[in-house]
A protein has these predicted regions:
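Long, low-complexity, intrinsically disordered N-terminal extensions of eukaryotic proteins, enriched
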Residues: 3-27, 286, 295, 331-333
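Surface-exposed loop/turn elements that mediate protein-protein interactions on large endomembrane-trafficking
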Residues: 3-4, 27-57, 87-151, 175-204, ...
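Residue position within the beta-strands of beta-propeller blades
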Residues: 19-22, 79-81, 166-174, 218-221, ...
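P-loop NTPase catalytic nucleotide-binding module
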Residues: 73-75, 144-145, 161-164, 187-190, ...
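Hydrophobic, aliphatic-enriched repeat segments that assemble into extended interaction scaffolds
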Residues: 22, 34-44, 61-87, 158-168, ...
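Hydrophobic transmembrane helix bundles of membrane-integrated enzymes that assemble
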Residues: 102, 192, 219, 277-280, ...
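Repeated scaffold domains used in trafficking and secretory/extracellular systems
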Residues: 4-14, 54-71, 151-163, 203-216, ...
Length: 419
């Protein structure tokens, strides 16, 4: 089972039986679990009498929640520590630097007590001074940590096949480089979850992961008649005639199958062939038309399946502001892109019939439409049904996907952790 992190913006993970996410506390993050069968959210800890506020707690992770990514594989939960900001500075030097910076007198820290302010930054320092590592979480007994060499700080962890994490080196897109030299093979890595053993390998030049796909990985790379030059100006000219090759790559064997080729586009700002996501077993791509001085408009939506069969879904794009969002299985959640400033769920696209159904269900508390967080193996969705004034989730509900698509609000409320 390959799965790219659906909610990579907050490190959460949905394995079909539960939804795992982090919640931020003062100086640390707690790992929460929403069990679909029980409809209960709880701290991922079963230690009797645990207060969940020290490192002895299996669910406790120092610093900021955004520095961690969780993945559930089998009966074990793993947490990858993202260490882009690793620093070996001593606590005394770090603390003196923060006190001298004046941050203590600025929002939101000006409302904290001295003890709270120190606790916040001690947690951040603890996280930043921790090397790249993999935690194995046992809710009943604690967590074990396997440290990796510092070179792994430069890798993102993008996919998991149930036993191994796969990542790739973080590189700035070549078009933004001042100096050349990023045209060579893309560094990649794999980490065995059971042992923590890690090794590196390389992808093709310019290649990078897009998503888990058909039991393997979907990748993207530029293909040209001649090797792309390293000079920035020559590269910018040569890339115009390149094609974007989309492949199915099995990183365990190196077997590669070409699925489709797409023409290079100056509107491909993400350098991914205008890839949107994998939905219901197919890879989705959009075509774009540049609007001089004001970005681009989406024009055509196409798919390709594991056999390389292509299909046009939309031509033209039905609503200019619509973007494809969360994967609901048969249904794709469509969101309204308010000029890249905010997103709101607006409709569901049925991948089997092509029918588009407006999302009419509103939050019970807070404003706006409900949104998807996970999907259970039994066909139910975990949806946000309540939020506070700051947009933080306060309530979840579980509901059958087809019933939701029919407009139902007959969801089963989740008993939320009251921490």
């Amino acid at each position: 089972m390959y799965k790219r992190q659906l909610k990579s913006y907050n490190g959460s993970f949905d394995d079909g039986t539960a939804y795992y996410e982090f919640t931020q506390r003062l100086g640390y993050a707690l790992l929460l679990k929403t069990d679909y069968a029980a409809a209960v959210q709880s701290v991922c800890c079963a230690v009797p009498g645990c207060a969940h506020d020290t490192d002895a707690c299996p669910a406790y992770f120092p610093g900021r929640a955004g520095r961690y990514t969780v993945v559930a594989a089998g009966d074990t939960v793993y947490v990858w520590h993202i260490s882009f900001f690793y620093d070996d500075q001593s606590w005394d030097d770090y603390w003196a630097e923060k006190l001298a910076s004046g941050v203590r007198d600025r929002e939101p820290f000006d409302t904290l007590t001295d003890a709270e302010f120190e606790a916040e930054y001690r947690g951040i320092w603890t996280e930043q001074s921790t090397p790249p590592c993999l935690y194995a979480v046992d809710p009943a007994a604690g967590k074990t940590r396997t440290d990796l060499p510092l070179t792994y700080r430069d890798y993102t962890m993008d996919a998991c096949d149930g036993s191994t994490l796969y990542g790739e080196g973080v590189t700035i897109p070549y078009r933004t480089q001042v100096s050349p030299g990023r045209i060579g093979p893309t560094p990649a890595c794999r980490i065995d979850l059971a042992t923590g053993q890690a090794e590196t390998f390389v992808l093709e030049p310019t290649e990078h992961y897009l998503a888990g796909f058909d039991g393997a990985l979907l990748t993207c790379r530029y293909v040209a008649d001649a090797p792309l030059p390293t000079d920035a100006e020559q590269y910018a000219a040569a890339i115009q005639s390149a094609t974007v090759e989309i492949d199915r790559l099995d990183p365990r064997t190196g077997a590669r199958t070409g699925l489709t080729e797409r023409p290079y586009s100056n509107a491909d700002y993400e350098n991914n062939g205008c890839f949107i996501g994998v939905y219901n077993g197919k890879a989705y791509f959009e075509e774009r038309e540049i609007i001089p001085g004001s970005g681009f408009r989406r024009t055509v939506l196409t798919t390709v399946d594991a056999a390389g069969r292509a299909e046009t879904v939309w031509d033209p794009w039905p609503q200019a502001e619509w973007v494809l969002g969360d994967d609901g299985g048969r249904y794709i959640w469509l969101y309204r892109d308010n000029y890249n400033t905010s997103y709101a769920a607006c409709a569901l696209l049925d991948t089997e019939t092509g029918q588009i159904t407006p999302v009419t269900q509103a939050l019970q508390t807070g404003s706006g439409a409900v949104s998807l967080r996970g999907k259970a193996h039994d066909g139910r969705w975990l949806v946000v049904i309540g939020a506070d004034s700051a947009g933080r989730t306060t309530a979840y509900g579980l509901i059958d996907a087809d019933q939701f698509a029919a407009g139902s609000t007959d969801w089963q409320p989740v008993a939320m952790w009251q921490g």
